[in-house]
Amino acid sequence: MASSIGVLVKFNLFIQAYVPMYFDRIPELVETYNHNINSGLFDKVYLVSDADVSSIYKESDIVKNIIIKKARNFNTIFRIINMCTGEKDINVFANSDIKFDETIKLASRMKNYEAYALTRYDIYEDSDEHQLKPGMKCYGITVLSGEKR
């Protein structure tokens, strides 16, 4: 359970799940999903999609499917989170290809009702520095504390 890592808040992961148009992406998505649900970082994982994605993502005790028919925008995201969250929970809404490590627990310092948009980075082959590649679009993770109004 995520709270046993020394953090007193509950961490929920909301994955924007989908069946990819190019099936060669499926192994990457499955590996990322398995990593995140087995990491111990999240108390609950929600697969948010507009279709049944059970053919790709295996069942788990901590996973719940949420099928939505509306386009995903922040109002929809907040509505979904409010249905599933407690006032003190940390809610991470992410694309399905993002792996998390212990650094996500830094979000436990968030104040109630704060929200952050995180970016991902790459390591250049000729450097150990973590930096963004020129022209790289960076999005895919939103972290929210507590219920949203």
Feature-to-residue mapping (PLM):
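N-proximal low-complexity "stem/linker" segments adjacent to membrane-targeting elements
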Residues: 1-30
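Short, charged/polar "capping" segments at the starts of alpha-helices
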Residues: 22-23, 51-57, 124-126
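Short, acidic, metal-binding catalytic loop of nucleotide-sugar glycosyltransferases
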Residues: 29-43
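Short, hydrophobic beta-strand segments that form beta-sheet elements in well-ordered domains
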Residues: 43-50, 92, 115-118
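Active-site-proximal specificity loops/subdomain of glycosyltransferases
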Residues: 48-91
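The conserved acidic donor/metal-binding loop of glycosyltransferases
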Residues: 90-99
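Conserved catalytic core of nucleotide-sugar-dependent glycosyltransferases
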Residues: 98-149
